[in-house]
Amino acid sequence: QSVLRAARLGLPLMVAIIGGSPIQFKPLFELYEKTYLDSGHDPATMRMGVHAHAFLGEDDKAVSDKYFPLYAAQMDRVGRSRGWPPYQRQQFDFGKTRNGALLIGEPNQVADKILYLRDTFGLTRFAAHMDVGGPQHKDLMKSIELFGTKVLPQVKGD
């Protein structure tokens, strides 16, 4: 209902994709776009975005090995109240693939995935949630730096 309401009112859409496969959200974006246009809004003003968990490092294996325990601990904290089984490395590794919801790894990997999401959904916005699991401040600052200096130029320049 919130997708329809936002579209009818001409409001922007931001979808949190924090698990599973992003492609499963495609019908929401299609519904929003159709309803937005059918409601008479200007296509040039349509804004759609994705919010996703992200974390970057210079080396994929190193950042993944360091970040996984923190991320898993947070997912387990959330999952306990929801009856989820413990978060596994397989889930994390799948999440990092093109078909998964995580944007974790080297800058080129993250940029490629943002471009894939943009092209798949017609995105105009992307929000990276980088502090999931409470990484060390220096690691978080490095992730933000890499996002700004390495990912953004690729995404904006495309």
What are the residue ranges of the model-derived segments?
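A cross-family glycoside hydrolase active-site/sugar-binding cleft signature
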Residues: M14-A16, G49-H51, A127-H129
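A conserved active-site cap/scaffold subdomain adjacent to cofactor or substrate pockets
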Residues: Q1-P22, F29
